[in-house]
Amino acid sequence: PGLGLFGEVLPMRGMSPDMTDTQQRAVHRHNLKAMMLAHDSSVDEALIDLQQANVARDRMRRRRIARTDVLTQVQANWTCAVHGVWGELDALYLGTLQQVPQVLSKLASFTSVPDAGHWVMFERPDAFHAAVDPLLKA
């Protein structure tokens, strides 16, 4: 989000105050699969619990900023090296992932992790750590 590369609108579902806990959990499951994870099998009850807690704390209910290119605009102000790790199957960048290093030209490095969605660190932790650990040791 914030790269100006957001393509297709994702099939996200909304909540309503009259939903039961079971219905809310079904919406979270659907939304996690639609946006955050590449594999249905990655969604379990513990992850739904985490997502419920995340959504309850969310202060930006609308995602207008996600559809802007604000991050590309502020990269000139970065005062340290910024490295990017994306999941190759990130639903937010399907068809545009290869453009990320071009629009974020100030990235010190760009890594694409195969077989992972937006939450690459959750879905493919070993590959994520293989990409990030050397950066932290540098």
For each feature predicted by the language model, list its residue ranges.
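Generic structural signal for small/hydrophobic residues in well-ordered secondary structure
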Residues: 51, 75, 84-87, 110, ...
